[in-house]
Amino acid sequence: MAELNEDVFAAARQRGRTLLTEELVALIERHHPHDRPGIERDIVTRYADGLDTDERSSSSSRDGGPDDDGTSFDFDRDAFLDEVDARLADTETWQGTDALYAPEDDRVSRYPARWHDALGGSTDVREFVVFLLEETDGYLDDLESGGAGRGIPEDELLDVVSVVGRTDRETAKARVESGRKAGDLVEDADQHPEARVRPRE
């Protein structure tokens, strides 16, 4: 049985009460090793169990008070798992930022099956950008981050590449930088801290 990745727990604790259901699924999908689209439902449950144990242990040590940094995690295992089930969309296309997807039976993903079918396991960042710009109805409209322009906000791009490409964000970022240096990718020159990435025309 695969070991659970401590980076998931660390990132979840850091986010605390602001951690959203879809963000936790994406964290698991990004950090837990896997070679197929999405994460096994049992693996998601194991992480929920671990976070629940972590929360109960922390609550006991602080007697119900705030964490040392002034925040409280308040993770509810059962509510999280119920929310995962409720958000599963029976579709292969993008259904909004709150949706989760089942790219295969008993597997959960932050992104639709069609994205995995087209790009699963790839780290060709230009291919990702073109796909996200041209083949994902509604996705760009749902993004709240990024500067002006018609490209993909870099942080969002790194999320998609790391999850669908089944790699780490450092590798994804290195691929973006390589694409810029090669002239395959450009950024809109609006000086926004998260400028949008697009293919060179």
Over which residues does each language-model region extend?
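Acidic, polar-rich N-terminal leader regions of halophilic archaeal proteins
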Residues: M1-E201
